């Protein structure tokens, strides 16, 4: 029975995480995998070539060797494993699963700060730091999404938590309170 895309990503992501952790190179492997993800998203032909069933394995290996020369031995070995087992089509999903495990271990969360106007990097960092402190996390990485309809304030969405401090939401609550009183 064939494994689903999610199952392949979970297995290989967990295997890479365990291997990197056991060999005490987790942070380095994480950094390299994030760089690799950026590169293959910018150049999707890399995955197409390495997943192409028509190309012979020697040509794929030669192509991979040219790409992987800047990576550590651990990452090179992992990429060769993906090539050997014909799993390169799942690379981005595997990296995403690896990143989830890395973030969980390091108490890192990612989320969105929705505001009426764009926030600068310092404001995003302070929001993230405040959320991290409140919820016992080491780091919260926030992406800023601009939505003028919230009028002001901020809506924070991190993992399964939503904190709606928008002016729109406060006005909605005041309106509901006035209606309830009448």
Curated annotation (Swiss-Prot):
Keywords: ATP synthesis, Cell membrane, CF(1), Hydrogen ion transport, Ion transport, Membrane, Transport. It comes from the Bacteria. GO terms for molecular function: proton-transporting ATP synthase activity, rotational mechanism. GO terms for cellular component: plasma membrane; proton-transporting ATP synthase complex. It is found in: Cell membrane. Its main location: membrane. InterPro entries: ATP_synth_OSCP/delta_N_sf, ATPase_OSCP/dsu. Pfam families: OSCP. The keyword Membrane applies. It is a peripheral membrane protein. Belongs to the ATPase delta chain family. HAMAP family: ATP_synth_delta_bact. F-type ATPases have 2 components, F(1) - the catalytic core - and F(0) - the membrane proton channel. F(1) has five subunits: alpha(3), beta(3), gamma(1), delta(1), epsilon(1). F(0) has three main subunits: a(1), b(2) and c(10-14). The alpha and beta chains form an alternating ring which encloses part of the gamma chain. F(1) is attached to F(0) by a central stalk formed by the gamma and epsilon chains, while a peripheral stalk is formed by the delta and b chains. NCBIfam families: ATP_synt_delta, PRK05758.2-4. F(1)F(0) ATP synthase produces ATP from ADP in the presence of a proton or sodium gradient. F-type ATPases consist of two structural domains, F(1) containing the extramembraneous catalytic core and F(0) containing the membrane proton channel, linked together by a central stalk and a peripheral stalk. During catalysis, ATP synthesis in the catalytic domain of F(1) is coupled via a rotary mechanism of the central stalk subunits to proton translocation. This is ATP synthase subunit delta. It comes from Lactobacillus helveticus (strain DPC 4571).
């Amino acid at each position: 029975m064939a494994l689903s895309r999610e199952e392949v990503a979970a297995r290989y992501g967990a295997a890479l995480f365990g291997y990197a952790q056991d060999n005490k190179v987790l942070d380095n492997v994480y950094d390299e995998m994030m760089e690799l993800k950026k590169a293959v998203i910018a150049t999707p032909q890399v995955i197409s070539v390495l997943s192409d069933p028509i190309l012979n394995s020697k040509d794929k290996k030669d192509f991979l060797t040219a790409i992987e020369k800047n990576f550590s031995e651990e990452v090179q070995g992992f990429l060769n494993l993906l090539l050997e087992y014909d799993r390169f089509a799942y690379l981005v999903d595997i990296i995403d699963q690896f990143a989830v495990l890395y973030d969980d271990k390091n108490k890192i969360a990612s989320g969105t700060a929705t505001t009426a106007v764009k926030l600068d990097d310092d404001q995003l960092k302070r929001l993230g730091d405040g959320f991290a402190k409140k919820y016992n996390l080491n780091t919260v990485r926030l992406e800023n999404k601009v939505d003028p309809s919230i009028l002001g304030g901020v809506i924070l969405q991190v993992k399964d938590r939503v904190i709606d401090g928008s002016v729109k939401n406060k006005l909605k609550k005041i309106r509901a309170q006035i209606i309830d009183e009448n």
